């Protein structure tokens, strides 16, 4: 997982980042987040060296990334859990 903070928060900067990320196969998922970070991405790489190269490449192509924080998943505790029907009916 990668937490991303953009250097600017204009709509055009967000759209530029999102368009580029959408076309990037290494990024499996990307969510816009409210709070101290702007985006949370799930990234796949065959090795740590490949991951580092990928992230440095993202910083070099002008996507407006100010900072990024790498979070390494060590164990899956719960994954792909559907929303219970009772929760979806409460809308």
Language-model segment annotations:
Residues 1-91:
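A compositional/biophysical signature of low hydrophobicity enriched in polar/charged and small residues
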